[in-house]
Amino acid sequence: MESKDQGVKNLNMENDHQKKEEKEEKPQDTIRREPAVALTSEAGKNCAPRGGRRRFRVRQPIAHYRWDLMQRVGEPQGRMREENVQRFGGDVRQLMEKLRERQLSHSLRAVSTDPPHHDHHDEFCLMP
């Protein structure tokens, strides 16, 4: 009788131990709800592995990335960018005007019938 009682106690203890282990494993399973997905060649350009080496998960692409950047124009950094673009645009415009004036002055000097004055540094003559 005693051996049967001990056998029953041992079984009960083993069952209790297994139930405790199952309870400890359940919270970990609820934390890891995402299914493991293996990367394929069709994964796309926006996907990359994340996490440990054992599991490979596909990182979700950023859907509203460009929209978010466009909304940031109202922030101080965006306003600074707009001011810089305007300033640099004005500088480039001035440089282009100066370059155009110089090119026109040189071309007009070559076409004009006036005798050349004392700036011979840009003219070339092969006559002796």
Swiss-Prot record:
Primarily localized to neuronal cells within several regions of the brain, including the olfactory epithelium, bulb, peri/paraventricular nuclei, suprachiasmatic nucleus, arcuate nucleus, median eminence, lateral hypothalamic area, thalamus, hippocampus and cerebellum (at protein level). Expressed in brain, mid term embryos and to a lesser extent in ovary. In testis, it is expressed in the pachytene spermatocytes and spermatids but not in spermatogonia. GO terms for molecular function: metal ion binding; molecular function inhibitor activity. Residues 117-121 are annotated as: His cluster. Residues 14-35, 115-128 have a biased composition (Basic and acidic residues). The modification Phosphoserine is found at residue 105. Induction: Down-regulated following RA treatment. Up-regulated in parthenogenetic embryos. Keywords: Cytoplasm, Developmental protein, Differentiation, Metal-binding, Neurogenesis, Nucleus, Phosphoprotein, Ubl conjugation, Zinc. GO terms for biological process: axon development; axon regeneration; negative regulation of neuron differentiation; negative regulation of protein ubiquitination; neurotrophin TRK receptor signaling pathway; positive regulation of neuroblast proliferation. Disulfide bonds: none annotated. InterPro entries: BEX, TF_A-like/BEX. The keyword Ubl conjugation applies. The histidine cluster (His cluster) and Cys-125 mediate zinc-binding. Interacts with neurotrophin receptor p75NTR/NGFR. Interacts with OMP. This is Protein BEX1. It comes from Mus musculus (Mouse). The gene is Bex1.
